[in-house]
Each structure stands twice: as structure tokens, then as C-alpha cells.
Regions:
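Short, glycine/charged-rich "phosphate-handling" switch motifs in NTP-dependent
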Residues: 108, 120
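Helical segment within the ABC ATPase nucleotide-binding domain
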Residues: 75-87
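Hydrophobic anchor residue at the start of the ABC signature
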Residues: 49
Length: 145
């Protein structure tokens, strides 16, 4: 056991949690003790997500969570984010340049154009509405809960 900041940490529990996260996010590594810097970029991204969820946040801010991850692993990561939102009630605020990705998992999508909120749209809104919002030409901010 380690004493860090006057808390007791159980090394076996930490290792088991690491193994669970490795399986959950399909992190390709030789062992749980392999240095993260020795992993591929995509697996490093998954480790970042695993670390963030280990803290059991109520709100999680993620930016480009699938950057550097292969197509098959993208779906796994996105499904994991959705599952943590639904099962654990974690609010996830995500930034991404991948509109299709956002539309596939988000309840609402805020469009920022030239540093200003242009619109808040539903993923089912039309491509034309998204285009206008991204161009900063949307007439009003739509907030629909």
C-alpha cells in the first residue's frame, strides 16, 4: 500500500482497475506496467480517456477523443462515452471537427463560428441548418431540451 496525500492506495486494486480499463477500451499493450509513451498514438488517446474516467467525474470535457484512433476503435471509444453518459450520468462536453461523429452520439451540438455561439442544434437537424450555423449565418440560437 502507498500513502499519497494521506490516502491509502491499494496497489492490487489499482492494478485490477488498470486491467479492467485496458480490456474495456481495448488498449493494445504488452502489460499494465508498459510505459504509455511506448504505446501507439491511438492507444495513448485511450489511456487518456481511461485516466479521466478513473477520477469518476460528474462532467468530462474531451477534445477530439478519437484523434489518431483507427476506424474500428473510434466506434468503441464513442460507444464508451455514450455508455458512461447513460449508465453513470456523466455529462460529456466534447469538441470535435468530425461533425458526423458528433451527430452520431450527441444530444445537442453547439456550433461556434468566429468565436461566437452560432447555434445549438439537434443531431437530426438538416445539413443546411448545420451549414448555415457553421458559416455564422444562422438567425437565432435554438435551444431545445
Amino acid at each position: 500500500k502507498w500513502f499519497i496525500f494521506l490516502k491509502i492506495y491499494d496497489k492490487k486494486a489499482i492494478r485490477q482497475h488498470a486491467i479492467n480499463m485496458i480490456k474495456e477500451l481495448d488498449i493494445r499493450c504488452k502489460s499494465p506496467s508498459q510505459p504509455v509513451r511506448r504505446l501507439s498514438g491511438g492507444n495513448q488517446q485511450k489511456v487518456c480517456l481511461a485516466r479521466a474516467f478513473t477520477l469518476k467525474p460528474k462532467i468530462l470535457f474531451v477534445s477530439e477523443p478519437t484523434r489518431g484512433i483507427d476506424v474500428g476503435a473510434k466506434r468503441l471509444v464513442l460507444n464508451y462515452l455514450v455508455r458512461m453518459n447513460r449508465e453513470k450520468g456523466i455529462t460529456i462536453v466534447m469538441t470535435s471537427s468530425e461533425l458526423a461523429e458528433l451527430r452520431s452520439i450527441c444530444d445537442r451540438i453547439a456550433i461556434v463560428s468566429e468565436g461566437k455561439l452560432s447555434a445549438i442544434l439537434k443531431p437530426t437537424d438538416s445539413d443546411a441548418e448545420f451549414g448555415m450555423a457553421m458559416a455564422g449565418k444562422f438567425q437565432e440560437v435554438i435551444i431545445d431540451e
